[in-house]
Amino acid sequence: MPRCWIGYLGVLSVRWSLISAVVLWAGAVTSSAAPPRDAEASVARQLQSTLTTNAKPAISSENWGTVHGRVTFVGDQKSHIRPRRGGVQADPGLVVHRANRGLKNVVVWVYRPRPIAVHPAYDVDATGTATITRWNRQLLPRIQTVRAGQALRLVNRGPAGMAPMINFLKNSPLGPALPAGAAAMQFRIQRAEMIPIRVSDSIVPWLTAYLMVQDHPYMAVSDANGVFELANLPYGQITLKLWHESFGYLQHVTWNGQPAELTRGKLELSVDSSIIDVGKIELESNSPLP
């Protein structure tokens, strides 16, 4: 082969080597540039996940417990009568289940000599409105619970006018006139009260209800079976108070089969699990036990 051809082939070989090297280098650059973009996307996803998770901490059920129990009346209802024009009547506030002796309308609340943590589930209730309605010759509900700062709404659904009277201990008294068919009236209750406050009607004296005002949501009213429940209490020592309109503070009771003295209705408990069963509290007459 002539030398000119050998030289020409050598030049072509060198050119192809250079082109291959450039192509390989370009591929290497493209390949190495992609991982940083993928890494950025991965970091962004992780950051977004972290922000979403930490935006509002989840409530741990391990920090809150629910307390429930039952109150029964084993005394004689016939001994609880009240004089009324035209004769006598049984105490309308003393409602006892005929079969299981459950005592209705026992007010149970957390006594608060110090601040207590409130579960976020109660945030919505704090801005709600509590209502007492005159209907069918009654004030309903018989016991209404209200948080300090909430609004109280008074409604007259009866055929005649009413003049509700609420003589608070810590708040200004209320005595509005509500003619039949009048629009409801609304008031804001600002301060907690020590005990349930009676709501009466100066026109119809036997119309009665009670209003319990506290600066926390941990209040309950026993149902027709005498059962009460306080949900989402913070862990720790608490003091409950028990009160009924026919007896005042429940003091001389039988608690789970044993005589017990509850000073001013106080019951000490430790909330240390998700469910605390107080058991059964029996009341006979609220007189000192032998």
Where in the sequence are the language-model features?
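N-terminal secretory signal peptides that target proteins for export/translocation
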Residues: 1-14
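Bacterial N-terminal signal peptides
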Residues: 13-28
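Extracytoplasmic copper-binding redox domains, predominantly the cupredoxin/blue-copper superfamily
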Residues: 34-290
